[in-house]
Amino acid sequence: MGSEMCIRDSFYSYNLFMHVPDGFMNVTMSAATGVISFGTLWAYIRSAKDLIADKFIALTGMMSALIFVLQMINFPIAAGTSGHLLGGALAVIVLGPRLGLICLSVVVIIQSLLFADGGLSALGVNVLNMAIVTSATSWFIVKYWIKFIGKNKTSIVSVSVLAGILSVVFSSIAFTIQYAIGGT
């Protein structure tokens, strides 16, 4: 689930913003996370050249479309907020860490540009939190925990669920640290 941020407007109603909106982080934090996010994305794109084949391109495109649609479905959490699935664990488990990160980054960038989910100045923050942190967390959990509990259907499902849950937790922690350092 991606967390929603509530900001009260002058009529005391709640406006919900998915992702981190423009102006929520200072310029330094926005620039730093932009460099980190797009530097990482560029490195992953260059390293994924060996994976680019017809079947991987189609699968990556379908996974991006699926995650895009799943992120459009919001459900209430509490106190005027709602959440949606992030899809990081799903993308990484199906596509691997490199294509999974690229897939999630494409989804976040399209949402920012076409639907104003977040904004251009906050794009680095959103890519870092929703693509890089969720991908890294999911891949680490799946790769290393499966060694301890074995590879069968039950263990793969349980590790996948754990990866999905913990990727959201670590993404939230990353946002909290970023906001503590560079929030406005």
Segments from the language model and where they lie:
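Short helix-perturbing small/polar motifs within transmembrane alpha-helices
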Residues: 130-175
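Short, small-residue-biased leader/transition segments that mark boundaries at the very start
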Residues: 1-7
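Alpha-helical membrane segments and adjacent membrane-interface helices in multi-pass membrane proteins
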Residues: 71-134
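Lipid-exposed faces of alpha-helical membrane segments in multi-pass integral membrane proteins
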Residues: 32-39, 62, 66-69, 106, ...
